């Protein structure tokens, strides 16, 4: 503790070194570091004041907020250094859960939209809705990049989405090194995204870290929403909710 003498601050113990322990008046409050955020993208919400971040450009007509929610126009791929259509929130702990609700009607396999967890354009996990040309239906798929090395954790067999489904909910849970995706169709039950053997697909969350990425590493992990159209730039995705919760 510090006291003032003749206009100068002095240590209360009269010495020049702070004691290892000291008493304070009253009970010390327990800090609450848990963070939670939820939005339905109201017309009057200031996205930037709500902590949303974007890559390189804040204007240009690639996003808008209306009565139906947040609308993203299809932009470049997650590995692009140019015109990406993406809005993200910072991940604030080592254990957290985020989810969104969206409507998306792709017509080409190069049109995707969904939830992305990333460090930068070299390191990310992406759960998305796209179009399967063989099955002629929408599918839920996943794409990962580890220092620029791409992989499709679900292989070619995405999760089929029936034509009657209007709203698709996507979720991601991170617990330390483990990242697990989930999904729900309309008002149905949540399902964990599974690998080919039927077990939950567990991805490596540690690839999205300063230590792993290495050179040029400073961004921190983010999670959010994106729409990609590498076909004709006509696709749009509507997101009517997003939530984030530290666990």
Regions found by a protein language model. Name each.
Residues 4-247:
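Extracellular glycan-recognition regions
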């Amino acid at each position: 503790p510090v006291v003032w003498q003749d206009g100068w601050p002095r240590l209360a113990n009269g010495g020049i070194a702070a004691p290892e322990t000291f008493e304070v008046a009253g009970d010390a409050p327990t800090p609450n570091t848990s963070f939670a955020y939820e939005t339905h993208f109201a017309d009057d919400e200031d996205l930037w004041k709500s902590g949303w971040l974007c890559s390189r450009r804040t204007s240009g007509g690639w996003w808008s907020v209306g009565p139906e929610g947040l609308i993203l126009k299809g932009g470049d791929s997650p590995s692009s250094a140019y015109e990406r259509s993406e809005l993200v929130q910072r991940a604030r702990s080592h254990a957290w859960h985020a989810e969104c609700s969206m409507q998306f009607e792709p017509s080409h396999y190069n049109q995707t939209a969904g939830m992305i967890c990333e460090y930068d354009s070299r390191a990310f996990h992406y759960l998305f809705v796209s179009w399967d040309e063989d099955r002629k239906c929408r599918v839920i798929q996943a794409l990962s990049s580890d220092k620029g090395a791409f992989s499709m954790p679900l292989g070619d067999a995405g999760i089929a989405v029936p034509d009657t489904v209007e709203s698709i909910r996507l979720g991601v849970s991170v617990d330390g090194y483990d990242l697990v995706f989930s999904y729900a169709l309309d008002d149905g039950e949540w399902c964990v995204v599974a690998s080919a053997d039927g077990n939950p697909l567990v991805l490596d969350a540690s690839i999205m870290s300063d230590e792993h990425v290495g050179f040029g590493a400073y961004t921190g992990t983010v999670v959010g929403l994106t729409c990609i159209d590498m076909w004709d730039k006509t696709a749009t995705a509507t997101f009517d909710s997003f939530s984030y919760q530290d666990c």
